[in-house]
Amino acid sequence: MTSTASAQQPVLRTKTPSYHAPPSTDPLSGATIHTLRCLDTPIHLGYHLIPHIAKTLLSTLPSSTYVLITDQNLEARCSVTTAFRREFEKAAVHLSSSHSWRLLTKVIPPGEASKSRDGKNAIEDWMFEHRVTRDAVVLAVGGGVIGDLVGFVAATFMRGLKFVQIPTTLLAMVDSAVGGKTAIDHPLGKNLIGSFHQPNYVFIDAAWLKTLPVREFSNGMAEVVKTAAIWDPIDFAKLESSAPAIRSAVLGPFAKDAPLDQGRTLETRTESQSLLLDVIRGSVGVKAHIVTIDEKETGLRNLVNFGHTIGHAIEAVLTPEMLHGECISIGMILEAEVARYMHGLSQVAIGRLTRCLKEYDLPVSLSDSRVTRLAKSLDVTVDRLLDIMKVDKKNSGTNKKIVLLSSIGDTVQNMASTVSDHIIRRVLSLAATVTPIHEQPNKPKVTLSTPGSKSISNRALVLAALATNTCRLRNMLHSDDTQVMMAGLHDLQAARFEFEDGGETIVVHGNAGALARPANDKQIYLQNAGTAARFMATVVSLVHNDGNQHPVVITGNKRMKERPIAALVDALRSNGTSIDYLEGHGCLPLAVKGTTHGFKGGKIQLSATISSQYVSSILLCAPYAAEQVVLELVGGQVISQLYIDMTIAMMATFGIKVERLLDPTTGRPSNTYRIPKGHYVSPDVYDIESDASSATYPLAIAAITGTECTVPNIGSASLQGDARFAKEVLEPMGCTVVQTATSTTVIGPKLGQLRQIGLVDMEPMTDAFLTASVLLAVAAHSPANGSTSNARPSTRITGIANQRVKECNRIRAMMDELAKFGVNTKEHDDGLEIFGIDYRQLHANVRVHCYDDHRVAMAFSVLASLAPGAILEEKRCVEKTWPNWWDDLERKLGIRVHGVDPECSPSLCISPSHFTKASAASTNGKPPTCLSQLTCGKALTPRKYSKHATIICIGMRASGKTFLGAIGAAALSRTFIDADVVFNEKLGAKDGLGDFVREHGWPAFRQKELEILQELIARHPSGALISLGGGVVETEACRQILAEYAQTKGPVIYIVRDTNAIVKFLATSDRPAYGEPVMDVYRRRNPWFSECSSAELVSYSEGESLAIQPCAMNVPDPSFTIQKKFGLETEVARFFKFVVGQDTNQIRDLVVDSRKGGRRTYFLSLTFPDVVPKLELIRSMESGSDALEFRADLLNPSGQPVTTPQIPPTEYVKNQLAALRHRTSLPIVFTVRTHSQGGMFPDGKQHEYFELISLALRHACEYIDLELGWDDDLLSAVVQAKGNSQIIASWHDWSGRLDWESESTAKIYEKACRFGDIAKIIGKATTMEDNYSLERFRAKVSATATKPLLAVNMGSVGQLSRIVNPVFTPITHEAMPFKAAPGQLSFRQVQTALSLIGQADARRFALFGSPIGHSLSPLLHNTGFAALGLPHQYELLESTEINDAVAAFVRSPDFGGASVTIPHKLNIIKLLDEVTDEAKTIGAVNTIIPIRDAQGVVTSLVGDNTDWIAIETLARRSLRTVHLADPNLTGLVIGAGGSARAALFALYRLGVKRILLFNRTLANAEKLAREVPPEWNVSVLTSLDEVAQLSADQSPSVVVSNIPAEGSTLDASSRGLIHLPTCMLRNPAGGVVIDMSYKPHYTSLLQLAQQVNTNHELAIGTNATKAPTRKLWAAVPGITILLEQGCHQFHRWTGREAPRAQIEAAAWDVYLQRC
């Protein structure tokens, strides 16, 4: 890169020479004009230029026709066409123009939609209609869309017309209007069709900017800041120092008596107008100069794309909600961070750029609330952005190029630089992983300067701001904390800030304590900056308030609103300052009103036991109090005295000497201070010491890795307590420490030789305890003096109690995160104890949750240098004190850092700790909307968690947490942990929890419960399912832990059970008594369970009864059925798999591009007011449906149809949903249809509507219908809270006025795609043309669609649209009480209609083989076709060989598929194009599937095998979840013939760990065992009696017989037959037996299963009059296997689930007759 740069020709970094020319007065118009040139194009800048434009064009570009094109918005606001026509007519008179001319005007629709081929054609057709000729001059009056579109029209119309740009937006003025680029959009991207066509003039009239919304002005300022950043440091300084004045030129306030054309001449132009025009002129000048040198963008011109590589990618995802300039603003910061990593761009430069962009209300991070509140923010992932960046005009092949800053006003190269993906990923990613380094032969020596001290920087800012003069602060920390402090002081008018030395020096012009309220009641937003918040609380009290003015509000982010400030508030209140808590007591936000004289002063008492910052806050402001302040510290030991001493020392430097009074009794210094009144006088220059807390991290790197590190500017003379860290912590741990007054050097011991130090008081250096903790974690050796209180080496850290109220509870954070690495800790009141381990025992691949705390992140990056695969989430939190820490860690300390995504969310807009985190640029500092805040009280909603995140179950005692949790754990193959069991094991409560409670009481129990919860979460972050005790939510600390876990780490599931059932169970329980009624306990806990959980699982009281397998009336036994299993266990497994995203039960092949065809999908709309009595009916109605629509708005507890709008009771909805869930396996579409949209839910009931939507989210519904009529913030909140649910964004128009091809419908579609995973638009047809219009709309949007579209017309005329709609067509059924919407059809009706209109061709199917005359296959498939209304036919094609008839059949155009049986299962392969891997493994094909293209033409024939699928499916359906999770699951296969290989394969795929194989001919079994893969783990038995030698629990749970029925017997004395001994079925957990023999259905094996079941029932005393709920052994006959494999064939051929009930009934009827 360096060589390339040096080889380039030097580029003069200036602007076009005309930029430097002074303005002139135009002789024609009298306006004051600045003139620039870009190539040959004059650019005129000024104010109120329409008269000037008219006179200039008539005099210099005479033409017969002037064509003015603008948009409807501008015309409506400014009457553009009228204004220009008037001035043209005036100009013609003024100029006495003799030539004939006309002015044609056209107003077009606004927005990007007009910038299309259709939009261009419309303009051109209009120009031809008006006989426009080649001498015409085209005027583009508008923003970028108008300029690009009209410019392209001018470029191509009659091969090119004269063209004038008159931009009216700031973005267009400084960007698109200059340079000659013109273009229109294509469905595949923006600006893909266009040309370079230089305008004849560009007229930049800044008066237009007053017509812009504030946001549009900011949007344009992004480009202004950008050009200054890459080219002109002087202009940049002007932009950052004069932002209020520049903004006021556009946003006001304006003088009431100002002339209407103010600014048109220099005499009337205000200072702010001149500043604005100056920065616009500067930006235009840069671009004009660059374009003049590089018109066609061969290199230099792409410098103006700074911020655009990443910014454009962000814009591609977030458009149109986020504007171009807003995305580029974020992109500039991210690209500057790339430059910092690659070329050392200073953090000062990034800080200046960040502050400057914020001054113009632009976002600077993806966590800005304007981004996070958008539904699309979930799609902003690293992979998505990198993929978009592949298509960028600056790229060279696959190499991505980014403009890299070297400093403010300069770039690394005079073109974009090549940047690798891993660097971009490193910058973009929210998390970081550190590559561990081990002992190196040549230990490196590193010298590393740390950033300026945060503590000193913040104090210096306050002191300098309150001073009477100017001070230059050097080495100040440029971070989030100091930025918000400067912003706050600026808003209070406390000081004016400037920058020198490239921003390294901050010049503070103090205002002598004369503060004022922020303009427009702006809140002072301090993020999570505790120091700034505490200092600012007293600073704002200096603002004088006569009692009539509003208070000043200081606020922060979520965590800042939890940090204590009560002691300081109490002290200020007692002194007369009025302070109100606006949210939680004792925390921000605060509304502060000073007195008439500001801060009163006098004697003040303050508790300083929590934070010394309270003391410093009052000390710093005390000189400006109305009375002399005497500050007395009360309440106990003062915390961090050294920081109080630091404040006093700094005050002395600024001219105020604080007197610490002596105790009259002892004569020793007391805790009382006298502060004289006065004004600070700043030193001319104040050098800020480097940060001692930050210095601990590089020094710790040296200590832990055995290397050497020197930190200059921190030594023994430091004011900071943390400077002691090296001598008092590292040296005793075995490091060599050399410390002078101004530097510290640490040399670490040999790797792994750190030692414990027993006891250390870190009260003087509390922030450094985190660094000490990670070092002590790998200190495996005892202290040098040999003293330790435990057998294991340990160190107890004391004096750090205040660390519990920092950015997080740091003591708990360190304990929890160290536990993940395998390090034990113990908490104490004033600190913690750490038990070290050998570094080689550290757990690998740990994900460290950083709690949005900079010190947690940096401390664990030290430990990660030895821990393989450690991932540090929220890496950006280091920006609080050391923004370039990750760069320095790699570039200076030599430890490689990579970017990774946090598991809790891949979105770059969502912090793992704060899903509602706001940035400093958010409006009034308010966080984005969250669903729970809006609609659901405090109930949480799901997230997309890691698939492996540990699940926690909570709920009332006896709700089923253990039972259901065990099922869930088995379904997910996870470890199940019962917290009650852990409690008993840890505390030896042999007689149960009741014993412990009786002995120690409930409070002691709750404390132990809290400790166990913390330990379980720390030790099992993934791969487990934990069931907690019912009372865990009684403790507030537990509730906070659970809520934080649910929001950031993993699912917390609330198990809900009917309270009456709970009471009944507890009546016989030995659990300790509550001491109060169970219902009272439930009422108290229920809200807590909701606010601590992210999902709810109903332990449905009827679930077990519903678990009985359904079957047709003529099926002899329920275990013979092919109908799908449902019930409690099935639903619990589905629920848990859905919550973690393992299997979301959603349709994966929804059609996106309707032009390409695809499988049509449908959902059945249920309209029952009570679904429970109709559950069996609903199952019979499911055939053909892909999902069920659950219409919550139509539910009614009375059981009567809903006739007027009403709100269904929430509990009723829950129970109805649970009942349906336990009776179907289909996905649920949860719908609440409002009355205006055609439903029965009252309009306007926002809270109740979203409460039901939240219910659906929490109950794991696969699809949720979300109406688009609600506010965007509400819709975004739902999308952010949807977890794994998919949103169907719906719009229903009942008026019949919806025009499918209108702009308004396009906007509805765009909005539906923005918020939904599926777009749903419903119109109403009155004519057939409405259906044709819909299909044209569908075809148009399909060209660029990324989301499936459900679009139909209601009404009988609209039925055609329902027939052809490919996605989730709502259908009804003849048995439904009424249709959910007019015109709904049944599935059969739709299929019949599709066939009639030629959209569903009739197909032919056949069975190949011999003999096949008695096969049930034709009956099976033809029954299915008829039941679903499909026009297909299945027949028999008998042959003993693969002949021409078979070949002709499979190659015929109407071939739909075929079944294959003996003798063709192998020979058929020669006719096939492909064979699946499964069929190859088994060595047989029994199914042929034709693959068709979008036109329906067969492109290939694929052979598959469904025999093994039938065996595996029926075995899995018959087994319990605990069977499938059994690590000793054993299977037995009898027979080694042709079907045995399919049976072995099926058991392997089932998850059987050991397969036993028996065959009467031993050699055949041994041969087969050798042929199959060794991972199948097949063992051959010489006799079935050998099973008796296995332990009972390792005996087979799955038995598959492949021998003829007549070949086996239960009689041990029979000769020549295989005897089936009872020992085969001795597993106490039972299982399933499958007999592949077709006849008879009641074989010896099935008889054996019946005998074992009978004996089992007798042994347990089953009441003969009561049907057992479940048999020990399920029995599956061969006929069931045949039907099951046939149903899988049916699905593969048709894409539809076979109607199993109808098929089963028909097949068994014929089968039993034949038997």
From Swiss-Prot:
Top-level taxon of origin: Eukaryota
Region (3-dehydroquinate synthase): 1-421
Ranges that cross the membrane: none
Protein name: Pentafunctional AROM polypeptide
CDD domains recorded: DHQase_I, DHQS, EPSP_synthase, NAD_bind_Shikimate_DH, SK
Residues annotated to bind Zn(2+): 223, 308, 324
Family statement drawn from the similarity comment of this UniProt entry: In the N-terminal section; belongs to the sugar phosphate cyclases superfamily. Dehydroquinate synthase family. In the 2nd section; belongs to the EPSP synthase family.
Biased composition (Polar residues): 1-17
